[in-house]
Amino acid sequence: MTIILTNDDGIDAPGIKALAQAVSGKNFIVAAPRDHQSGCGHQVTTTRPINLQRRSDSEYAIAGTPADCIRIAITQISQDVKFVLSGINAGGNLGVDAYISGTVAAVREAAMHGIAGVAISHYRKAKQNFDWELAAKWTAEVLEELLHRPLEPGYFWNVNLPHLQPGETQPELVFCQPCTKPLPANYRIDGDDFYYVGEYGKRERTPGSDVDVCFTGNIAITQLRV
């Protein structure tokens, strides 16, 4: 069974290295964007060539979006892909974030082709540093649970890790529903220019939703569909 690893932060980002650490010992191929693609959503490339750089037998840097990476991985790199993992994103992809997230788009694209997948993101609190070793540990625990759970066709998992401080209680895995409340749409205006200043951590949230679960220190797991 071949697992494809991808992300939207780029192939050299620390998050995808932590993801590789989480699946150490499994048969995986990294097929990830050559450059940063955060916030690209489900964009695909159809009007220009997509350059592929083979770094090794199991690592490919692709000059495209996360969805492009999955399309190329499952049609050109391996015919035996059984699972797609996307992440670990440096920042949350909670609730309605899924619609603009390249991280989530990668596993949505996989689901469209009948391949199961998990998107993993790490909420960041107040621009504090990430502990990628800890993120890899949590991700391994999550995948131990999810890789063996059946998924109906067209469904996929979206996981968000909390941002905890040393000594805080170990997070629980909580299966929940995605929050449908919007992201803050606040802007600073300078002449004809609008600068986004919405504060992610101050977004509204429905009690018990993925935003609420993650913001209160637990691992939020939602099942989404195409």
From Swiss-Prot:
Chief location: cytoplasm
Keywords: Cytoplasm, Hydrolase, Metal-binding, Nucleotide-binding
Ligand binding (a divalent metal cation): 8-9, 38, 89
NCBIfam families assigned: PRK00346.2-3, surE
Family that this chain belongs to: Belongs to the SurE nucleotidase family.
GO cellular component, one term: cytoplasm
Source organism: Nostoc sp. (strain PCC 7120 / SAG 25.82 / UTEX 2576)
Protein name (Swiss-Prot/TrEMBL): Putative 5'-nucleotidase alr3139
UniProt cofactor(s): a divalent metal cation
Example of a GO MF term: metal ion binding
Pfam family, one: SurE
Cofactor note: Binds 1 divalent metal cation per subunit.
Enzyme nomenclature, EC number: 3.1.3.5
Function comment: Nucleotidase that shows phosphatase activity on nucleoside 5'-monophosphates.
Family matches, as InterPro entries: SurE, SurE-like_Pase/nucleotidase, SurE-like_sf
Cell compartment(s), UniProt: Cytoplasm
Catalytic class of the enzyme: hydrolase
Catalytic activity: a ribonucleoside 5'-phosphate + H2O = a ribonucleoside + phosphate
UniProt xrefs under Gene3D superfamilies: Survival protein SurE-like phosphatase/nucleotidase (3.40.1210.10)
Highest taxon of source: Bacteria
